[in-house]
């Protein structure tokens, strides 16, 4: 898969991934009503970056930027949309390692931001932290099947 696509396209083209997502999002263990709502209303998109070498952040950033532009252009009703970014999982899944992994991921992704703003781990740990790319605010959530928590 080269670009982000709607969850309905995932159903047609990658039924295994669709079933994995459906199983996760409809599970009683998954408490995110927003994600479930996005999934059922067909407002969910997926970008499969699992084949990218060593986290090609520029490609991921470009897809997120394109997704944001697409939603702004076609979202006349001000609905909320979700994009799931599928990446290769880290080798280790301890809580501390995953925390460092997601911090590093966000910091490196932010390096491509057109605003030239930078973030640090200390910024991310602040109560009022908001992650943004090109002045658009994103709510990143890490899903890791091997982690003890379903949503983080």
Regions found by a protein language model. Give the residues of each.
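Non-catalytic accessory regions used for complex assembly or targeting
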Residues: 1-76, 88-90, 100-116
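Short acidic, S/G/P-rich loop/turn micro-motifs used as interaction or catalytic elements
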Residues: 53, 90-94, 145-148
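Solvent-exposed loop and beta-edge segments used for protein-protein assembly and interaction
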Residues: 77-79, 134
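Non-heme Fe(II)/2-oxoglutarate
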Residues: 81-84
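A short acidic (Asp/Glu
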Residues: 94-99, 151
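Aromatic/basic-lined ligand-recognition segments
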Residues: 119-152
